[in-house]
Amino acid sequence: MQPSESMYPPAILVIDETGRFCISLLSGHLGGANTLAEEISGLMADKGMIPVITTATDREGCFSVDEFARRNGLVLTDFQCAKEISAAILQGEKIFFDCSYPVEGEVPEELILEKSRGKENGLEREEKRILISDRVYTAAGAAKKGCCLQLLPKNIVVGIGCRKGTDKEMIRQAVTAHLHSLCLSEEAIAGVASIDLKQEEEGILAFCREKQIPFMTYSAKQLQIQMGSFTASDFVEKVTGVDNVCERSVVASGAALLSGKRAENGVTTAVGEYQRSIVF
């Protein structure tokens, strides 16, 4: 496999024939090869094994945006921009850091922390910055000038209700339309939730397989005990035993309901968001 063929190349390590060196060869940060090399060397410390880490930011002891993204479960949206930011850091430049979530830990000296306020916060200035948000619009204006790297948290849950036999494309259209109405990125979806009567619904399963996200299902009893104000339907209650599926499923997953029931072509969706923080 050529590295360019995969957005997230796998971690590749090489151990020399004497067992002296464990070399992180490919995907040191995103693939975790650097960490794995250190772990293996630690296990073989009594044999004198030494980890060999060659990524520039590690050699210089600088902040690494791709390692930071990996540790926080964030999606890198632009690898070229990530390279530009890493190169700038190695040259001693300061990078602006906008984050829509609480920040824990000490912010590295290479970053200038700003509270994200969209365009009003200067995202259209010609400067390099890292932006953490699940919103689509935040990167759009900034991308026109300078280098704005958006890191996407996977913190969105979509609750789904549908007729039996609904195909994947109809599921996708309904989910996409709802997320776009909220200016949310599809890449931010952490999972899909529904009632257990839908646990074998092929359209939903196919959508989840494509997105590589979990499909969480709950019994009518589990959904019924959820607290909140939900859009009730007598018809849905007769069929499923609970007055609402999509909204209650979101809440059952542990997410806060962000947008209530929306119907499109026989598919109902609701959108929720997990609370999270960013850790340095």
Language-model features: locations:
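Aromatic-enriched hydrophobic runs in primary sequence
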Residues: 1, 150, 177, 207, ...
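Generic structural signal for short, solvent-exposed loop/turn connectors between secondary structure elements
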Residues: 2-6, 250-257
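Conserved mixed alpha/beta catalytic, RNA-binding, or beta-rich assembly cores of soluble enzyme
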Residues: 2-77, 81-199, 272-278
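Alpha-helical scaffold segments in soluble metabolic enzymes
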Residues: 35, 39-43, 206, 247-251
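Stable alpha-helical structural segments in soluble proteins, enriched in small hydrophobic residues
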Residues: 174, 178, 245-252
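C-terminal non-catalytic interaction/assembly regions of soluble proteins
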Residues: 188-247, 254-257, 263-267
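N-terminal basic/disordered segments at the start of proteins
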Residues: 260, 265-280
